[in-house]
Amino acid sequence: MDGSMSTQFTDRPEPARPVDSIKAKYLRRLVETCRREGIRLVMVVSPYYFTPSRAERLRYDSLYSLYVGKDVPLLYFKDLEGISGNDSLFVDPSHMNREGARRFSTMLADSLASLFRP
């Protein structure tokens, strides 16, 4: 996706939502399956346009601690400096455009490489 985010989105952060029990159930199953099969799992939260509210950050923290555990690294990029808040890198508050995705992919690759280096 190319282009910039429409100004209709730039003044309305998304409200914090409760954790969806069905999604949490399947996340738990995914984590259990990966552990059982010896698959190394990393959780990634990609950038959003808006800086998340305290309530939104707490929702991610609770989801992570309740359903994932401390043995799974969490790469939290939701409020990534240089990307979040830059309307030229998003098509809407939740989706980066091609350039935003390119920049984020580079940062994510670096973070993953540092996790998996011996």
Named regions from a protein language model:
Residues 18-23, 49-59:
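Acidic-and-aromatic substrate-binding clefts and catalytic sites of carbohydrate-active enzymes
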Residues 1-37:
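Secreted/periplasmic serine-hydrolase-like ester/acetyl group-modifying domain
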Residues 54, 59-118:
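C-terminal regions of proteins
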Residues 19-20, 38, 49, 108, ...:
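Non-transmembrane, interaction-prone segments in cytosolic or luminal domains
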Residues 14-16, 48-49, 93:
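A short, structure-level motif marking secondary-structure boundaries and short turns
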Residues 28-56:
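Active-site segments of SGNH/GDSL-like serine hydrolases
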